[in-house]
Design a protein with these regions (language model features):
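Transmembrane helices of ABC transporter permease
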Residues: 40, 44-54, 88-98, 159-213, ...
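Membrane-integrated ABC transporters
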Residues: 1-59, 74-88, 103-107, 111, ...
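Helix-loop junctions and hydrophobic alpha-helical segments within the transmembrane domains
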Residues: 122, 126, 235, 335, ...
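ABC-type nucleotide-binding domain
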Residues: 355-628
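Helix-loop-helix
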Residues: 78-80, 84, 177-191, 261-333, ...
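An intracellular "coupling" helix at the cytosolic face of ABC transporter transmembrane type-1 domains
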Residues: 131-132, 148-157, 161, 165, ...
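Juxtamembrane helix-loop junctions of ABC transporter transmembrane domains
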Residues: 19-27, 50-51, 58-71, 79, ...
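Alpha-helical membrane-protein architecture signal
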Residues: 27, 31, 35, 46-47, ...
Length: 628
């Protein structure tokens, strides 16, 4: 809408790091919702848990087999038995490796399908949200839900959940076997593990703080870069390159400092844990060696030392995986916030349908474009569509504290062209958005052929309205596909006819592949005027009974505007047309011109009547005032 600026804000771009740690607000509730998505894979998840148990058991058992390997075969010199035992150990490790591969593959399948469903549900939910929702959420914020947050969930499902269970099982199994081998050495190791846990908590806590600062800083950098890229022309016109560089340097330095501190603490974790592990190993060797001399259990000492190496690894990994999972749950929570947002309300029962007239004069529904429409009431009766649109004392505001439109009343008949003139923010686009029911009014009524638009299903209502917005938007695809977006079942001939009607056929045929020329997003290879012509052709393809032109020629030069005037007149013939004017020359032939100021209609009449009033319209037309 013209009155609303596009929501873009720094700090929400998709390029932000995922290293920052975020705790979920409702851990249990969000996990429950995630489990709802994973519930379809219960059988596979049971298999994963079984494979995890087997894999962890093999890892623990493999180390324990070192004891009989040394005591029963190496020391006695039983090399045949040694060979057999080596084969047993190899078999144990092979089984563990196969199980690890198996659960990893299954989790990839489960994770990717779950994330695909989550992403699809999020996208589908977006299509059901009212425009008011997008007015209060930045583009970058919404994109981060699709990218950062869902990717964090994917990463956790792919690796972290299974790894957390595996590490926990391995840790418990290892500690149990250490107690079996030597309670004394286990007590020594437990003391060192306590020190390790303290180090993990201290370093991890500070690391998370600085990673959060890093994430905030990179968000600010991304937002600034996005803003500067979009505003390059303005920056160069006003010669503000130096100021732009200075602003970026400050943000970049802040990010550098935050990232340096975050990475310094994160990088200290592994060396600290490694050194503590080495100290623990050395102490265990000394004490264990003395015990082995007394008991002669060299194999038990060797097995215990192997467990000593293993036991510290799960501690670090469990801490890392827990943080990753909590971040993923926080990301999922943000996704579910959108999914639980209030959808667009549609209580309409009346529908608009394409119809054909039978020889006896009755109407029947048609599944192709007949150029005729009718209301289909709840009782199934069909009433021809006329195209009368009436506003009766309409009051509207985006919220109750800020009213945008005050007591708007107007009436438009088929074949009439109603124009809206006024300064930016006067409420011109808002009026046409209310016809579409993009927003709900506070009071008053808007009727379409005498039927309250709130009683009409929104999809049917919008299908009957052709809209050419002031902001052109083209999709990646062919020229024909972009025109056909107005009516997906349009034939190639109908697409070309719509282009000729809009005056776009000429330049389209000069494109490399004509109507099959592939356009990039937003039609970057076309001029602004050419993009707008395709927008107008799209509306012509829809062949609607009511047409809304939201400053449709504001981006077209005067020469191009002259080329399409006749086509636009043909497009508007017989239709109810609402025009939001950027150039007053485009509304001279309007049946009625509404002059708006601060949300109220202050003047109305045709061109000659308004000039005779010597009011606001007269000032605008004669150049005594400007459309600012």
């Amino acid at each position: 809408m013209a009155e609303n600026n596009t929501k873009r804000g720094p700090g929400h771009g998709p390029g932000g790091p995922r290293g920052g740690f975020r705790k979920p607000k409702d851990l249990r509730g969000t996990l429950s919702k995630l489990m709802g998505y994973l519930g379809r894979y219960k059988a596979l998840l049971v298999i994963v848990v079984i494979l995890l148990f087997i894999s962890a058991a093999c890892s623990v058992a493999g180390s324990y087999l070192i004891k009989p390997l040394i005591n029963d075969y190496i020391l006695p010199g039983d090399f045949i038995g040694l060979a057999k035992m080596l084969c047993v150990m190899a078999g144990v490790y092979v089984v563990g490796a196969v199980c690890s591969y198996g659960y990893a593959r299954i989790m990839v399948h489960v994770a990717q399908n779950t994330v695909a469903k989550l992403r699809a549900d999020l996208f589908n939910k977006m299509q059901k949200l009212p425009l008011k929702f997008f007015d209060t959420h930045t583009h970058g914020e919404l994109m981060s839900r699709y990218t950062n947050d869902i990717e964090t969930v994917s990463e956790a499902l792919n690796n972290s959940f299974a790894s957390l269970i595996s590490c926990s099982l391995t840790f418990v199994g290892t500690v149990m076997m250490m107690i079996v081998l030597s309670p004394i050495l286990t007590a020594i190791t437990a003391v060192m593990l306590g020190v390790m846990l303290l180090v993990v908590k201290t370093i991890g806590g500070r690391s998370r703080r600085y990673f959060a600062a890093q994430q905030k800083a990179i968000g600010a950098v991304n937002g600034y870069i996005e803003e500067m890229i979009e505003g390059q022309k303005v920056i160069k016109v006003f010669n503000h390159e130096a100021a732009a560089k200075a602003g970026f340097t400050g943000l970049n330095d802040t990010y550098r400092d935050a990232a340096t501190r975050a990475q310094a603490y994160a990088g200290a974790m592994m060396p600290a844990m490694g050194n503590l592990s080495h100290i623990n190993y050395a102490i265990t060797c000394c004490v264990g060696g003395l015990l082995a001399i007394r008991t002669g259990d060299l194999g038990g000492l060797s097995a215990f030392l192997q467990y000593t190496k293993q036991v510290s690894q799960p501690i670090t990994q469990i801490s890392q995986q827990v943080n990753t999972i909590l971040s993923a749950v926080a990301g999922a929570e943000r996704v579910f916030e959108i999914m639980e947002a209030e959808p667009e309300v549609d209580d309409g029962k009346v529908t608009l349908e394409r119809v054909k007239e039978n020889p006896d004069g009755t109407l029947t529904e048609a599944n192709y474009d007949t150029g005729a429409w009718a209301w289909k009431k709840p009782d199934g009766s069909l009433v021809p569509l006329r195209g009368d649109v009436r506003f009766d004392h309409v009051v509207f505001g985006y919220d109750d504290r800020k009213i945008i439109l005050h007591d708007i009343s107007l009436f438009a008949k088929p074949g009439q062209k109603i124009a809206f003139v006024g300064s930016t923010g006067a409420g011109k686009t808002t009026i046409t958005s209310l016809i579409n029911r993009f927003y709900e009014i506070q009071s008053g009524t808007i009727t379409y052929d005498g039927i309250d638009v709130r009683d009409i299903q929104k999809d049917s209502l919008r299908r009957s309205l052709g809209v050419v917005l002031q902001d052109t938007h083209l999709f990646t695809g062919t020229v024909a596909d972009n025109i056909r977006y107005g009516r997906l079942d349009a034939t190639d001939e109908e697409v070309e006819a719509a282009a000729r009607l809009a005056g776009a056929d000429g330049f389209i045929r000069h494109l490399p592949d004509g109507y099959q020329t592939v356009l990039t997003s937003e039609g970057g290879s076309l001029s602004q005027g050419e993009r707008q012509l395709l927008n107008i052709a799209r509306a012509a393809c829809a062949n609607p009974p009511v047409l809304i032109l939201d400053e449709a020629t504001s981006s077209i030069d005067t020469r191009t505007e002259k080329l399409i005037e006749k086509g636009m007149d043909r497009l508007m013939a017989g239709r109810t047309v609402f025009v939001i004017a950027h150039r007053l020359s485009t509304v001279r032939n309007s049946k009625a011109i509404m002059v708006l100021e601060q949300g109220s209609i202050i003047e109305r009449g045709d061109h000659e009547d308004l000039l005779a009033q010597h009011g606001r319209y007269y000032q605008l037309y004669t150049g005594q005032a400007e459309l600012a």
